[in-house]
Amino acid sequence: MKNCMMADQRGRSILKHQPVVGDEALEFSRGLAPSTFGFRYAAYMDRNHFLPSGRTAVKHIADPTLAYVMTRYRQCHDFVHIITGCGRSIEEELAVKIFEWKHTGLPLGLLSLLGGAPRLAAAQWAHMRLYWEWASRNAPCSRHGEPAVPMYLNVPWEDMLAKEYDEVVAYTGITPLPQFLEKRQQH
């Protein structure tokens, strides 16, 4: 993950400045217009009774840069829920984990899929193929040397809070899962 961040200009800037998403970002987001990315973030956090400060600190990683990368991975998880349009059902959480695995290569996503699979009904399990396709289409890629879909750790989410949700979707190139599923049903 560090190498992917170092290979990207925005990623290098994030590693240099090491922004941390704190409770003040959530408080700021609560006052934003309903059409903004930040408002959706605040609504998600409040609905689930989450606070940015509620995340356990990264431990057992001696290298400060690698520790920050893991901190960013944890903090960006909530932003991934917002940009992908995924809630917190087991099925949606597994879709997010597949998406995160496609972006980071961390095996946690696949392990979560294996751990969550027994809790899914047959119809829900059948959806996993669609979620895999969606995550694959939203994996980091570039066109003409420019990132079409940046690795999500390289997105300056903390600077996107006041922007319109649709503007953030366009910036990231990520198709939210509900939109992907709607298009699939039309075909």
Curated annotation (Swiss-Prot):
Positions contributing to Zn(2+) binding: H77, D78, H81, E93
Recorded catalytic activity of this chain's protein: a 4-hydroxy-3-methoxy-5-(all-trans-polyprenyl)benzoate + H(+) = a 2-methoxy-6-(all-trans-polyprenyl)phenol + CO2
GO CC terms in record: extrinsic component of mitochondrial inner membrane
Membrane topology recorded in Swiss-Prot or TrEMBL: Peripheral membrane protein
Functional pathway: Cofactor biosynthesis; ubiquinone biosynthesis
Cofactors that this protein relies on: Zn(2+)
Keyword list, A-Z: Lyase, Membrane, Metal-binding, Mitochondrion, Mitochondrion inner membrane, Ubiquinone biosynthesis, Zinc
Keyword DNA damage: no
Pfam families for this protein: Coq4
InterPro entries named among the record's database cross-references: Coq4, Coq4_euk
Enzyme Commission number(s) from the entry: 4.1.1.130
UniProt-annotated location(s): Mitochondrion inner membrane
Gene Ontology biological process terms from the UniProt entry: ubiquinone biosynthetic process
Additional remarks: This protein may be expected to contain an N-terminal transit peptide but none has been predicted.
Assembly, per entry: Component of a multi-subunit COQ enzyme complex.
Function according to Swiss-Prot or TrEMBL: Lyase that catalyzes the C1-decarboxylation of 4-hydroxy-3-methoxy-5-(all-trans-polyprenyl)benzoic acid into 2-methoxy-6-(all-trans-polyprenyl)phenol during ubiquinone biosynthesis.
Recorded family membership: Belongs to the COQ4 family.
Stated name of the protein: Ubiquinone biosynthesis protein COQ4 homolog, mitochondrial
UniProt organism field: Leishmania infantum
